[in-house]
Amino acid sequence: LAIIYRLPPDLALKRKAGLPVEVTIASVEPYLSTEEARAGEIREGLAKQIIWADPANPSRTALSVIYIHGFSASPAEMRPLPDRVAEGLGANLFFTRLKGHGLADPDALGGATLGDWTADLEEALAIGRLLGDRIVVIATSTGASLVTWALARPVVSENVAATVLLSPNYGVQASGSFLLTGPFAARIAHLVIGPRRGFEPVNALNAHNWTTDYPVEALIPMAQAVRLAA
């Protein structure tokens, strides 16, 4: 049993990672709009989004910036920090949205998997390569866990020039958290934690930009991402 809990998470991807080869800098925004329309109702301003360095002339820049948000958060988590960084670098900017996040239905977070999130990250990196010659990655919390995994894989992290990891999630503090990456994790979480997890938002903006109440199953891919980064 101890050996099972030490094994890395199984990355059985159910979605093809990366970006279709036919997507160009001219078609990337329509592509994202089509993909996001399939996700369900996304809260205002929280969809995947490109901020062009020159909106009047959308074109490739020397550097691109991509932002990977944390668990239960959204692309708006650290704004305007990524915007300011991109502006200072004269870079195009891409905000990804990890599956299950930023949706009107909070239960959607419980349906996301680790494979979904690594696919979203790989897509973000591919878009970063499309938008710029080299990529600056900014990531927070569990987003930083995913980026740490990617940095160890040259094929995934190709053309990454710099990374900024804000409060990276390299360990779940709750006692017994290792159970979230082992057998029967969902059943154990229900018994120990209950059916749902969440927090009280401090204001309306916090409530909008975060999923503040979600199924306990959502903790499983978060814990797996931490293990993946180890």
Q: Would you name each region that the model predicts?
A:
Residues L1-A26:
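N-terminal membrane-anchoring alpha-helices
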Residues E41-L98:
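Short, surface-exposed "cap/lid" segments of acyl-processing enzymes
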Residues Q49-S59, N209-A230:
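Serine-hydrolase catalytic core
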Residues R97-G102, N169:
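Short beta-to-alpha linker loops that shape the active-site pocket of alpha/beta-hydrolase fold enzymes
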Residues L103-L131, V136:
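Catalytic nucleophile-loop/oxyanion-hole region of alpha/beta-hydrolase
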Residues I138-V147:
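Gly/Ala-rich beta-loop-alpha elbow adjacent to hydrolase catalytic centers
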Residues V164-S175:
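Active-site nucleophile loop of the alpha/beta-hydrolase fold
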